[in-house]
Amino acid sequence: VIKHTNMMFYNFSITLKTCDMDLILCDMPIWKHVYHTLHSLDQWYINPEVYTEPDFHEPNLNSLDDYDNQKVLSREMLIDYFETIKEKITEYLNSLCDEDLYEKPDGCEYNRLSLILGQFRHFHCHMGNINATTIYNTNKWPKVLGMYWLDKIDDCEDINDLYE
């Protein structure tokens, strides 16, 4: 779980660097899709019943059904939020043992493994949508590291390695 979460984080760091935040997808700018993806990860990966919104959050800011065009999140804000989530989830995962994955967090109807797998599904779905806009508009394929890279994530840090 830890290695796959780290791979997910690395792949999304590439997405954050390659996407056009102002591009519109389904009537919403990409930055809003990015925030929706990150907000869901932040809320649901650990325990949705014990969750505090980020300081900059406003009602419906994470919604892909509601866009009032009042607040815009910059790439820098989203990267900072992403880094905060990464730290929180990494600390959380390092505190767990395998048996903990089958237990339900306080007040939650799902066990920890279900929450994590649900976020893998949701996160990768949205990351794919965001990456598809980059592919369509630039004719470049953002690098997505797979199983081969599980033990080699640190080998792809150069900006020139952001695309396949």
Describe the function of each predicted region.
Residues H4, M8-T15, S40, I85-K88, ...:
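Amphipathic, well-ordered alpha-helical segments in soluble domains
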Residues S13, K17-S63, D106-E164:
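Short, contiguous alpha-helical
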Residues I2, N6, D27, V34, ...:
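Generic structural concept
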Residues D65-E103, L113-H124:
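Acidic/histidine-rich alpha-helical segments that form the ligand environment
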